[in-house]
Amino acid sequence: MVDKSNKVALVLGATGISGWALAKNALSYPSRSTFQRVIGLMHRPRTVEETGLPNDPRLELYSGVDLQGDLNHVVVKLKEKIPRIEEVTHVYYLAYMTLQTCSGDMRQFRDANVAMTYTAVHACDRLCPNMEFFVLQTGTNAYGVACFDYLRQTQLQVPLRESNPRVPRPWSDTLFYYAQADLIKEANKGKAWKWCEVRPDQIVGHTPAQVSVPYVAPMALYLALYRYINGPGARVQFPGTVRNYHHTYTDVRPDTMARAELYLSLVKSDESHGEAFNIADTDTPGPWSAKWPSICRYFGLEASETIDDEWTDIDGWWYANQTAYERMCAEYGLQKQVMSPTAWSLMKMGHTLIDQNRELCLDKIRGLGFTEDHPVGSSYFQVFEDFERMKIIPPKVVLASPRCRDVLHQC
């Protein structure tokens, strides 16, 4: 266990799905006394209340620093914005430039993320003389999971292990994880601080400030509205392909991922230095065929046995039924959500294009003593319960009753 000390965490990207969980968990894991300060850097200004993070005097949130800027300018802005930044001992790099922000240009997407990482690690190296550890979070594209041209040429060897060779060129030309890890390794030469890379696959979670970003939000809203319109016991079809329905993978909740990153950087900093680690809720592969029926039952629905071999256009159905959605929100006092095309696009991609088995091997992180484990698919129900409390979907007791359809038919 980590002793009480003067450790200070800096979370870059503190309101994203990963950074939010890291900032929250750093206040209590491995213990409440581990960090005397938890500093979150955000792209946009938000209050603690708006972020949904705990109201803890150790938590500090700052914005107004664009990591896409010139390194020298970023150094000046960080020093200006964050009091006593020199106290920082642990940096968690969870910032990310989206493909949509780069107008779908894959090369620009790669270059922007590499440049941000370069700026972040070198700025922290300059400003934080007490820095002990730097965590880089990447993902399973380190194995080519979302490199679709590559997947047409090869079959992934599962379970995916950290020792797997890199995706070869030209398929890896637009992947930025390798360049991120390489530049941190280079920056670390001759320095006292340590670093590691953490690789999750599908992250099942949300943040109060960005509900619509992860695909679990459009899924939950679609199923809630489908139940409202069609009534209890209605059969609902899996929206993706047959291959996607049956392929195996290992997802992770943000809290598990955050605690793993804290564990590696605090408890096993020597052993994890310079290494990459897979992380998931469990090493038991969980295909959609093991999750979809129980997810449907949560919403008072039954999973249809019919599965098409293409996207079922649930986004089109959603937009066509906005009148019913507004009625459902009014009836149950829900907070109306606006689903962006990006949210639906991410869901469509995950349910149609990724159609190979891709489960992760967790032997490496388990070997260092991080053994947190959760049942297959349980992360979805945790998110659904959060959505109920946030009044994004009707309560489960309502979904389990026949009243939704009766209300609609009376209107």
Swiss-Prot record:
Gene3D superfamilies (alphabetical): NAD(P)-binding Rossmann-like Domain
Keyword Signal applies: no
Active site, renumbered: Y249, Y263
Annotated residues for binding of NADP(+): D105, Q137, Y249, R253
One GO BP: terpenoid biosynthetic process
Its EC number(s): 1.1.1.-
Keyword set, alphabetical order: NADP, Oxidoreductase
Any one GO molecular function term: oxidoreductase activity
Entry-linked Pfam families: PRISE
Pathway(s) served: Secondary metabolite biosynthesis; terpenoid biosynthesis
InterPro entries in alphabetical order: NAD(P)-bd_dom_sf, PRISE-like_Rossmann-fold
Broadest EC class assigned to this enzyme: oxidoreductase
Role, per record: Short chain dehydrogenase; part of the gene cluster that mediates the biosynthesis of calidodehydroaustin, a fungal meroterpenoid. The first step of the pathway is the synthesis of 3,5-dimethylorsellinic acid by the polyketide synthase ausA. 3,5-dimethylorsellinic acid is then prenylated by the polyprenyl transferase ausN. Further epoxidation by the FAD-dependent monooxygenase ausM and cyclization by the probable terpene cyclase ausL lead to the formation of protoaustinoid A.
Family annotation (PANTHER family): 3-OXO-DELTA(4,5)-STEROID 5-BETA-REDUCTASE, NAD-DEPENDENT EPIMERASE_DEHYDRATASE DOMAIN-CONTAINING PROTEIN
Miscellaneous section: In A.calidoustus, the austinoid gene cluster lies on a contiguous DNA region, while clusters from E.nidulans and P.brasilianum are split in their respective genomes. Genetic rearrangements provoked variability among the clusters and E.nidulans produces the least number of austionoid derivatives with the end products austinol and dehydroaustinol, while P.brasilianum can produce until acetoxydehydroaustin, and A.calidoustus produces the highest number of identified derivatives.
Family that this chain belongs to: Belongs to the short-chain dehydrogenases/reductases (SDR) family.
Protein name, entry field: Short chain dehydrogenase ausT
Species assigned in the record: Aspergillus calidoustus
Gene: ausT
